[in-house]
């Protein structure tokens, strides 16, 4: 039942939109939603998780790289005083044709982002519940203080009347003492009520980040509710939309996918590689021209390459089998969360 409470509270808040009290409550919640650091952190974590989907997808897309080199060589003694300037540039393209681990990593990140999104929704529900609770605690504290103050005035009048009657000899001193004790008690109750109100206001400030000089009271006369559905129908609807159960199911799916990812460690990979490059080398020095063995000619070359890269893991010391077992144990643990 505790898991269903945030959803029921959220449904209740959505039904108050036509009431002036609900408008104020919704305004308070909107301020809490914008200023609450825990919810902002949860939103940032959710956005980061969805951004990681792009990172997980990137290895499946073409990888293009540009490289360039420059080398200057100054020769002396055995190098016959030959100087050289060499420049080269290359463009490399790599495209994954088959690599199941990369596809699996993308699926895992999508599921992880889904879990983070549910976590954010859960934090939203928690904030709704906390805001509504703090809001109504303030209203309740105001009512208690008002009642205590009214009670204090009534008891004070009773004390005044009893004192006057004692002065004319109509009652005993014990009646005055009893009335005084009641008045002292209600004074203490008033102090307690004021402290409770201050605490309730401070609790609301901690949630929303603002102090509110006035909060709208409940409009009981205009309060209307729809005809309630059968309890079983409400329970089924709440269980269907329960975020804790949804998060547990997504965690189970994630654990199941991690088993497949571990099993993919036995599969081969195939990549397409292509490159084009040019190089230019020039020589200078006193002996660049001379005997046949010491003649150096400038060169300018270009080269294109296309190839396939295939890899098949055969044995990795039992690591893959261990990873599969570990993932299976994690799946059992995630499944137990649904029980």
Identify the residue ranges that each predicted region occupies:
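Periplasmic alpha-helical coiled-coil/stalk elements that build and connect Gram-negative outer-membrane
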Residues: 3, 126-241
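Sec-dependent N-terminal signal peptides
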Residues: 4-12
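Bacterial Sec-pathway N-terminal export signals of envelope proteins
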Residues: 8, 20-69, 104, 211-256, ...
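N-terminal signal peptide c-region/cleavage motif recognized by signal peptidases
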Residues: 15-17
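Transmembrane beta-barrel architecture of outer-membrane proteins
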Residues: 27, 86-88, 133, 178, ...
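Extended amphipathic coiled-coil alpha-helical segments
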Residues: 41-59, 103-136, 140-164, 181, ...
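Small/polar-residue-enriched beta-strand and adjacent coil segments characteristic
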Residues: 63-76, 80-123, 246-258, 266-339
